[in-house]
């Protein structure tokens, strides 16, 4: 049954990618394709907008630098904080669905990707004791001639920079993410996203504020079924 769910996700992924392609960033492909040898971001290996060699930068902890951006300007991130930061990086660089939320003003960027409240709260909890100097990681850096990032402000704890998980999710990457009012029609950067994506795509022609209660109910029902299948699969492997 879990294999059926994965197959369904592959079908959804294929149809989505034909419609949206990939973002137009410096590491993105023109269109998603399989990358079976990914070192990280394996959630997207069956249909990826990044090449496998890009993920080498994310494969070893602690992560120092990704492309021309250093992650350790205020000291190394804790492993738990690094893991969440990596999930966001993987989504932006590799997800075949990211272009569903492309920013029309800048086609290498995303806008208003719906994240689950629980994901944002867990991310904040993981990073609250780490330090940061840029409120917006996209704009609040001093960039040198090579494009590398340097702090313009002093390093402070995440818990001082951001009030809570909602503030962090809706500030750290500028307008890239928003916290969803739904607990199902939102992304968690894990396999459960295969359920949410199907229903988010069906709402793609609607205004984001007009959330369909029927879609919410259908999503919740399928999410419960998916979780049960995952639990069943885990028990079979024991």
From Swiss-Prot:
Phosphoprotein among keywords: yes
N-terminal signal peptide: 1-17
A Pfam family: Folate_rec
Keyword Glycoprotein: yes
Modified residues (Pyrrolidone carboxylic acid): 18
Cystine pairs: 22-49, 41-90, 50-94, 74-155, 81-127, 116-186, 120-169, 133-151, 184-219
Tissue specificity comment: Yolk RBP is synthesized in the liver; egg-white RBP is synthesized in the oviduct.
Post-translational modification: Plasma and yolk RBPS have the same carbohydrate components, whereas egg-white RBP has a different, ovomucoid-type carbohydrate chain.
Descriptive protein name: Riboflavin-binding protein
A GO-annotated cellular component: external side of plasma membrane
Residues the record marks as carrying a glycan: 53, 164
Single GO MF annotation: riboflavin transmembrane transporter activity
Outcome of swapping residue 31 to K: In 30% of egg-white and yolk
Cross-referenced InterPro entries: Folate_rcpt (IPR004269), Folate_rcpt-like (IPR018143)
Keywords for this protein: Disulfide bond, Glycoprotein, Phosphoprotein, Pyrrolidone carboxylic acid, Signal, Transport
């Amino acid at each position: 049954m879990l294999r059926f769910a994965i197959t369904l996700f592959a079908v959804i992924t294929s149809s989505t990618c034909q419609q949206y392609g990939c973002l137009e960033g410096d590491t993105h492909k023109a269109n998603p394709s399989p990358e079976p040898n990914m070192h990280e971001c394996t959630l997207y290996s069956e249909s990826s907008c990044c090449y496998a060699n890009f993920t080498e930068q994310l494969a070893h902890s602690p992560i120092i630098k990704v492309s021309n951006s250093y992650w350790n300007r205020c000291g190394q991130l804790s492993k738990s904080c690094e893991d969440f930061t990596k999930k966001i990086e993987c989504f932006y660089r590799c997800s075949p669905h990211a272009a569903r939320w492309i920013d029309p003003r800048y086609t290498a960027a995303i806008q208003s990707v719906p994240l689950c409240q629980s994901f944002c709260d867990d991310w904040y909890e993981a990073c609250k004791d780490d330090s940061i100097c840029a409120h917006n990681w996209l704009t609040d850096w001093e960039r040198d001639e090579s494009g590398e990032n340097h702090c313009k402000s002093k390093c402070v704890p995440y818990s001082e920079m951001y009030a809570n998980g909602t503030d962090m999710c809706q500030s750290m990457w500028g307008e890239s993410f928003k916290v969803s009012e739904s607990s199902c029609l939102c992304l968690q950067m894990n396999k459960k996203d295969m359920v949410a994506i199907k229903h988010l795509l069906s709402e793609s022609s609607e205004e984001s504020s007009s959330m369909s209660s029927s879609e919410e109910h259908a999503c919740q029902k399928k999410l419960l079924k998916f979780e049960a299948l995952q639990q069943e699969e885990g028990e079979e492997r024991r």
